[in-house]
Curated annotation (Swiss-Prot):
Gene name, Swiss-Prot/TrEMBL: kynA
Protein's recorded name: Tryptophan 2,3-dioxygenase
Free-text function comment from the UniProt entry: Heme-dependent dioxygenase that catalyzes the oxidative cleavage of the L-tryptophan (L-Trp) pyrrole ring and converts L-tryptophan to N-formyl-L-kynurenine. Catalyzes the oxidative cleavage of the indole moiety.
Subunit structure: Homotetramer.
Cofactor binding: number and manner: Binds 1 heme group per subunit.
Effect of Y130F: 15-fold increase in catalytic activity
Skewed-composition ranges (Gly residues): 18-30
Superkingdom: Bacteria
EC number: 1.13.11.11
Length: 299
């Protein structure tokens, strides 16, 4: 019988001693684990942890500012992954490669679920605690997140006015401008349906990509045909449901944002100059994929 080696990643290795206890230090490593990384890449090296964990620089003396910084930095990391997945999924839809796109869209929805839960951590910050650090934030606001703006644009909520907060950083402005001028995920899905023979109005298939998604009757008619006969159009049916899953998760993320902000600052104006909760509530009315929601009434 061959000797048990355990998981190739080093987990679950066979005990080094006869009784299977915890005293597995043989002098060469703990249960066979490599202990010397003077010449090899370690966990921290691979993840760049020195850079990540030294990127928190509170400006106030308040204990709770670290929570505020870590909350928003981790959100930006998750949004980086969302953009990675959304761009690839959009490319998949554009090239008629829907199966890989389904996995990517499902992953984005789960990331949004993660971000919904993250608001529960920030909600542990009370109004007095936030008030103690708020003066140190200046005019900085999540409203200015260029990654969030890219996500909005990729999902079809275009607004050229939202370029202005990024004008002072040309490298960020270029990314947001590119997202503004590129067909959204939903635009590519509609063009895919047209390529597959559905009767879509030409002005929708080739439109001004800088404008937000608007309801169109021919698009709803196409989706209705898909939903009335899913077995004949299974890929498009699954794509439609992936979009609905994604928007549902996005709405929950937005809603939890509203309730957390109201809990912490009430109806004060946001640090970025917006109306705070009132502005965020209006954003809840944005519909990314209008035909996919309306058809549920019309089926």
């Amino acid at each position: 019988m061959s000797e048990f080696k355990g998981c190739p990643m080093g987990h679950g290795a066979a005990p080094q001693n006869g009784d299977g206890g915890d005293s597995g230090d043989t002098g060469n490593g703990w249960h066979g684990a490599q202990m010397d990384f003077a010449r090899d890449m370690s966990y921290g090296d691979y993840l760049g942890l020195d850079q990540i964990l030294s990127a928190q620089h509170p400006l106030s003396p308040d204990h709770n500012e670290m929570l505020f910084i870590v909350q928003h930095q981790t959100t930006e990391l998750w949004m980086k992954l969302m953009l990675h997945e959304l761009r690839a999924a959009r490319d998949g839809v554009k090239s008629d490669q829907l199966q890989p796109a389904f996995k990517m869209l499902a992953r984005v929805s789960r990331i949004m679920d993660q971000l919904v839960q993250a608001w529960n951590v920030l909600a542990t910050m009370t109004p007095p605690e936030y008030s103690a650090m708020r003066p140190y934030l200046g005019a900085s606001s999540g409203f200015q997140s260029y990654q969030y703006r890219e996500i909005e644009f990729i999902l079809g909520n275009k607004n050229a006015a939202m370029l202005r907060p990024h004008a002072h950083r040309p490298e960020h402005l270029e990314l947001v401008e590119t997202a503004l001028h590129t067909p959204s995920m939903y635009d590519e899905a509609i063009r895919l349906m047209a390529r597959r023979g559905f009767q879509i109005d030409p002005e929708v298939v080739e439109r001004d990509w800088t404008q937000p998604t608007q309801y169109n009757a021919s698009v709803e008619a196409a989706w209705l045909e898909v939903y009335r006969n899913p077995s004949a159009h299974w890929e498009l049916y699954e794509l439609g449901e992936k979009f609905v899953d994604l928007e549902d998760a996005f709405r929950q993320w937005r809603f939890r944002h509203v309730t957390t902000v109201e809990r912490v600052i009430g109806f004060k104006r946001g640090t970025g100059g917006t109306e705070g909760v009132s502005y965020l509530r209006r954003m809840l009315d944005v519909v990314l994929f209008p035909e996919l929601w309306k058809l549920r009434t019309d089926l």
